[in-house]
C-alpha cells in the first residue's frame, strides 16, 4: 500500500488501527522514533516543529492521535 492509500485509509477510519501499523506508517512518512516512556512513543520529522506522541492502548492507536497525524500530513503537504 502506498502513502496515499495509507493516508486515505487512516483518514476514513481512524479507529481500529493497530499501534505497530501506525508506527510503520509514521516511519513511511519520514517520521523518526525518538524514544518515549511506558506506552508512549515520540516521533519527529525534520522541517515539522510539532512532535507526534502516540500511545499504545491495548495494541491499538488512539483515534485522536491518528486524526492529529492526518492534520499534519495535510498542513505540511506530505503526500506530495
Q: Model-flagged regions — what are they?
A:
Residues 11-30:
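Polyanion-binding surface elements
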